[in-house]
């Protein structure tokens, strides 16, 4: 358990003078659907925001994907990184099914690791990142990042270095 340390470099990278950056920590021992009202309350409280960009990693990507039909009034980009969107366990224990549509104001990006290099997923007999959702842009991450294996935790740093936050 990295206890969130994998977010330090990415947050330092994307936080700048023109970007207001927030970190939302939630109870990952609970099903993600239970957290949506709390997160929507936080998003709704933001004033004078023209656009929001949400990055969710791993299980946080599941939480982020549940916002596809929730956010209506603000231009939104949702980026899910190394997220087990097709997890049979989440379906079994939480009743989670990935959304089948999204609001028109929402752009959706999936950043997928290479399963055999991702130690969170390489023991699965399927790739839990794979879903059939035509309204998303899918980016397959490379094998290496800064000369090292690009696995589950490094994926956030790679995205922070390569995402366009305009």
Name the predicted role of every residue range.
Residues 9-13, 41, 157-162:
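Charged/polar, solvent-exposed surface patches and flexible loops
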Residues 6-8, 34, 121-122:
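Short, glycine/acidic-enriched capping/hinge loops at junctions between secondary-structure elements
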Residues 5-9, 76, 137-139, 156:
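Hydrophobic transmembrane signal anchors and adjacent membrane-proximal interface regions, especially
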Residues 2, 21, 26, 33-118:
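Serine-dependent carboxylesterase/thioesterase catalytic core
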Residues 96-166:
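C-terminal catalytic-base region of ester-bond hydrolases, centering on the histidine
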Residues 1-18:
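Short, surface-exposed "cap/lid" segments of acyl-processing enzymes
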Residues 26-27, 136:
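Short, acidic/turn-prone active-site loops that include or flank metal/cofactor-
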């Amino acid at each position: 358990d990295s206890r969130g340390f994998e977010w330090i470099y990415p947050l330092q990278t994307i936080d700048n003078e023109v970007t207001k950056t927030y970190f939302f920590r939630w109870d990952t021992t609970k099903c993600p659907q239970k957290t949506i009202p709390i997160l929507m309350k936080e998003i709704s409280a933001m004033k004078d925001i023209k656009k929001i960009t949400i990055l969710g990693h791993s299980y946080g990507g599941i939480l982020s994907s549940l916002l596809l039909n929730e956010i209506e009034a603000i231009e939104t980009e949702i980026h899910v990184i190394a997220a087990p969107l097709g997890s049979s366990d989440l379906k079994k224990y939480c009743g989670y099914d990935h959304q089948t549509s999204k609001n028109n104001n929402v752009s959706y990006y999936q950043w997928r690791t290479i399963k055999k290099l991702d130690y969170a997923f390489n023991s699965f007999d399927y790739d839990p990142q794979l879903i059939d959702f035509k309204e998303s842009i899918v980016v397959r991450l490379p094998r290496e990042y800064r000369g090292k294996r690009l696995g589950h935790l490094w994926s956030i740093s790679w995205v922070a270095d390569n995402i366009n936050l305009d």
